[in-house]
Amino acid sequence: MDGSVRSEDTWTVAGRTFRSRLIVGTGKYKDYAQNAAAAEAAGAEIVTVAVRRVNLSDPSQPMLVDHVKPDRFTFLPNTAGCFTGEDAIRTLRLAREAGGWDLVKLEVLSNTKHLLPDMEETLRALKLLIADGFQVMVYCSDDPVYAKKLEEAGAAAIMPAAAPIGSGRGIQNALNLALIIEQAKVPVLVDAGVGTASDATIAMELGCDAVLMNTAIAEAKDPIRMARAMRHAVIAGREAYLAGRMPKRMYAEPSSPLSGLI
């Protein structure tokens, strides 16, 4: 598929339309300059920002917005590091006051060892945030039942973890992801657990609308090159999904016709 055709393959969340299907984070880089270079190399249009960990408002210290420009990227504030619904809601209200952001990513973690989501707290916080005027993309477990509950509660997007945050273990439960994608009427994005380019490709081949990653790029030996690799991986996976893979067969089938042989 040529570039002109691919450019029309967009996705939409909360009324906002994007061409890039790769979302990148803003943590773990050696500095904001490297972070900005990686975001550019990834071809990203959205960057997710941990409100509690990134300087957005103190001009006396290095600021993310001096390097990753809000007029170039859509900022997606998140609640990384929050373990209660109240903490997450307070964090996102501060983000809205600081930058006017109402499209946000909710994550309410259950413990510090695996950083998997507390789904009861997540669902409760989601309902309160929606009532407060936020458009919420939700980090969640790969449980199709809870994913549907989040969608029915008004989530703008469902973001199941492929594996624990920062683990780099890749997609651990492709079946559950496929079930979530099949039933969803809102975008589904793999969030957390991607380790290398093939993981991103698999996520897109399953039918995900996009992939979010941070550590896989930031902790690579060459983050900028890995960002480029992830960009191509996401495109390849999406193209393969749209093309439709060949069926799997039990037995061989010759690739050349048998008729007309000497």
From Swiss-Prot:
InterPro entries: Aldolase_TIM, Thiazole_synthase_ThiG, ThiG. It is found in: Cytoplasm. Signal peptide: none annotated. SUPFAM superfamilies: ThiG-like (SSF110399). It catalyses: [ThiS sulfur-carrier protein]-C-terminal-Gly-aminoethanethioate + 2-iminoacetate + 1-deoxy-D-xylulose 5-phosphate = [ThiS sulfur-carrier protein]-C-terminal Gly-Gly + 2-[(2R,5Z)-2-carboxy-4-methylthiazol-5(2H)-ylidene]ethyl phosphate + 2 H2O + H(+). GO terms for biological process: thiamine diphosphate biosynthetic process. The active site is at K105. Its EC number is 2.8.1.10. GO terms for cellular component: cytoplasm. It holds the Pfam family ThiG. Keywords: Cytoplasm, Schiff base, Thiamine biosynthesis, Transferase. Coiled coil: none annotated. Pathway: Cofactor biosynthesis; thiamine diphosphate biosynthesis. One of its GO terms (molecular function) is thiazole synthase activity. 1-deoxy-D-xylulose 5-phosphate binds at G166, A192, G193, N214, T215. It is an enzyme of class 2 (transferase). Homotetramer. Forms heterodimers with either ThiH or ThiS. Belongs to the ThiG family. Catalyzes the rearrangement of 1-deoxy-D-xylulose 5-phosphate (DXP) to produce the thiazole phosphate moiety of thiamine. Sulfur is provided by the thiocarboxylate moiety of the carrier protein ThiS. In vitro, sulfur can be provided by H(2)S. PANTHER family: THIAZOLE SYNTHASE. This is Thiazole synthase. It comes from Phenylobacterium zucineum (strain HLK1).
